[in-house]
Structure formats: structure tokens, C-alpha cells
């Protein structure tokens, strides 16, 4: 694309580096900002800069937080002995929205993925193992997405925990509530039969 | 959505005010920025701010420009007596990409649209009429998109020009090059028959 303005070109170039945003979309977004009051652009720039410069990770669970210890870890009514291992803050938000979990989290910050150059040392696996070795945790719940990378990460952590007396579990895989069996994929349906639960348990909440 | 961080919430709120970007996409973009080097966020913020604060409109054609007179208007090899009326810079870029047009442009900055509260006074119609009255222009080419708003705007300008000796034209509507007649809509096909051109003209470039 040939731009009549260097300023416009720079803004579009920077914008189009965001994932899923091409040059055309970037141009549309930037032209939208030009039509809005200058304040909107100022606030957007300020919010992004402040976030990037001042954001902290919770000292205990490595979730994104404004304080040294995040709200969840600082809440005394939550069970600190149960820890749910997740990939990032989006998973924490999804589980929190269910209202079904009262334990702590441990945010890995990604999954082991040699293809993307992400090894165990780039993730917060070491602090998790240390917490376990310090005897602070009774149970670890693996809640990573069930992809090749997710399974690899689960297995790596599981291996690291060998020799400790900790209880490990993983979230149940099965047919979604409200789904038709007919349209479910074989792997999920197969797992939901193998891991069937006593009927009386399914009537709780 | 409940965020564990006010900074994150603010950034997502500002980001999701852009058109076509919802809360979830905004969160994905913001988390992406957090994973990239701090420099990327700094440059994005800077580029957006500089654009918004320093951008100029060309004194002659009202296109976005870094200088008082844009490159096209300042180019002496272009024909200043023919003016193509377009909606915004994207249309200028599209026509420039064809390499078929050597005249000037006049960027309206929008279309007359009472539904969105945009009247003739918010557009650069007055300066266009003044240029015509000053006798600087021989021909005006209307190149707005053929929607209700585009047609209204064309007609409004056409009416304003009544009494002047200026030649007006509009870009040809018809079947796209390479398209099958079978799948063309009736209005376009009808227009392309009514406005048929001598066959020998169609063989030029």
C-alpha cells in the first residue's frame, strides 16, 4: 500500500503487527481514531503504555495483578492447599466465572512448545515444584487445554512431581452439557464413557 | 468480564472501543502486547499519538497529508483541471493503485447521512463549489460508492453546481472484469446494458 502520509503509514504498520490485524483492518482502525475526538487516542495510548510499564505478576500464582499478591491469593477464605494449573489469565477468568472453584491458581504463562521455542524454563514450572516441595499444597488440578502442547506440559510437570506425596487430578473431558451425542467427536465420547461417574454424583448442583 | 487488574481492564476497555473489536479480541490483543518486548507497545502508542496530534489535511484536496499541500496536488505533472470527488483516503489509494488517473482529487471526508447526523456542512463540499466558481476546474468526476448516501451526496453537489458551465461525470457501473454474467445482480447488469460503449473503445488498454 502507498500512503500519502508517513505518520499514517507508521501508525498502520504498528497496528498491523497485532495478531489477526492486517494492513487493511489497521488502516480502518486508524482512520476511525482520526474521526473520533483526540481524547480517545490519548486514552488508548496511555492505557496501553501504563499497562505495559506498570503491570505486575502475583508473587505466588504469577497471574496478572496490580499488587504484589493478587486478589485471589490474598483472599483468606480461599483454600490455598488446592492449586489449579492453567496457561494464562484467560483460563483463570473462565474458571472464576463458573463460581465452582474456591482454591488457588498457578499461571504457567504458556505451554511447552518446542516449535515456538518455548521450553520448561520459560514457564513458571520451577516455582510450582518448589511450592509442592515446601509441603504447602495437597492437590494439583491440571487444567491446560488438551492439545499436544497441553498434554506435554501436564506430563512434564507430573514427572517432576514423582517422589512427592502430592495428589494430582485433571479436569474431566466429556460431552458438553446440552450437546447431542450424535455430533460429538469419537475421542471425547470415548473418554466420557471410560471416565463415567456414579449417576448419583451427576445430580449434585 | 471480571479482571484481576485495573490496568488490564482499562487497556481492554479502550481497545474494545475500536470498531469490530469486542472485549474478547481486545483482551487477546492486549495479552499479546504483554508478551512482546516493551518497545512494541511504546512504538504503537507513539505512532498513534503522533498521527492524531500532527496529522494535516491538504489545503487543496483535504486528503490526509504530512504537508500543507499533498504530494498529488503539489505534483506539476498532474492535471489540476480534472477533479475526482471521493469519500476518503482509502478511495484515493484505490484509484491511485490503478495507475489510470492523472488528475487531482477532492476528499469529502464522508457522505451525507442524516441517520448518522452527517449533513453537507460537515463535509468539504463548500470548498469544492468555491474551486468550481473560481473557474479552476473543467470536469468533476463523481466516484462515491453507489449507496443511498453516496447517491444523495452526488445529487446534492450536482444541484449546487447548477448554473456553472462545468462538465460532470460519474465512474462507470457495470460487470466486473472476469465476472460471469449469470451471477451478476440485475441492477448492475441492467446499467451495463443501458450505458454500453462502442466496442472499439473497450479494446483500449
Curated annotation (Swiss-Prot), chains A, B:
Keyword DNA repair assigned to the entry: answer is: yes
State the protein's purpose: May play a role in DNA repair. It seems to be involved in an RecBC-independent recombinational process of DNA repair. It may act with RecF and RecO.
Q: Where is the Toprim domain?
A: 81-176
UniProt zinc finger (C4-type) residues: 58-73
* Entry's Gene Ontology molecular function annotations: DNA binding; zinc ion binding
Q: Does the keyword Zinc-finger apply?
A: yes
The record lists the organism as: Christiangramia forsetii (strain DSM 17595 / CGMCC 1.15422 / KT0803) (Gramella forsetii)
Q: Which GO terms describe its biological process?
A: DNA recombination; DNA repair
Leader sequence segment = none
Give the family from UniProt.
Answer: Belongs to the RecR family.
Q: What is this protein called?
A: Recombination protein RecR
Lineage top rank: taxon:
Bacteria
Read off the Pfam families from this record: RecR_C, RecR_HhH, RecR_ZnF, Toprim_4
Amino acid at each position: 500500500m502507498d500512503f500519502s502520509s508517513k505518520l499514517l503509514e507508521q501508525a498502520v504498520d504498528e497496528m498491523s503487527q497485532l495478531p489477526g490485524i492486517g494492513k487493511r483492518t489497521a488502516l480502518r482502525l486508524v482512520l476511525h481514531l482520526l474521526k473520533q475526538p483526540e481524547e480517545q487516542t490519548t486514552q488508548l495510548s496511555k492505557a496501553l503504555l501504563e499497562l505495559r510499564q506498570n503491570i505486575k505478576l502475583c508473587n505466588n500464582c504469577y497471574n496478572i495483578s496490580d499488587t504484589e499478591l493478587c486478589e485471589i491469593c490474598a483472599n483468606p477464605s480461599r483454600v490455598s492447599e488446592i492449586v489449579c494449573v492453567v496457561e494464562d489469565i484467560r483460563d483463570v477468568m473462565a474458571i472464576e466465572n463458573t463460581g465452582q472453584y474456591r482454591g488457588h491458581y498457578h499461571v504457567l504463562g504458556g505451554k511447552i512448545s518446542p516449535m515456538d521455542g518455548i521450553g520448561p524454563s520459560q514457564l513458571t514450572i520451577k516455582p510450582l515444584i518448589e511450592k509442592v516441595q515446601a509441603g504447602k499444597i495437597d492437590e494439583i488440578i491440571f487444567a491446560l487445554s488438551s492439545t499436544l502442547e497441553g498434554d506435554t506440559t501436564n506430563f512434564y510437570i507430573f514427572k517432576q512431581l514423582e517422589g512427592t506425596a502430592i495428589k494430582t487430578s485433571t479436569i474431566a473431558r466429556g460431552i458438553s452439557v446440552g450437546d447431542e451425542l450424535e455430533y460429538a467427536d469419537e475421542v471425547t465420547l470415548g473418554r466420557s464413557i471410560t471416565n463415567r461417574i456414579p449417576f448419583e454424583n451427576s445430580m449434585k448442583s
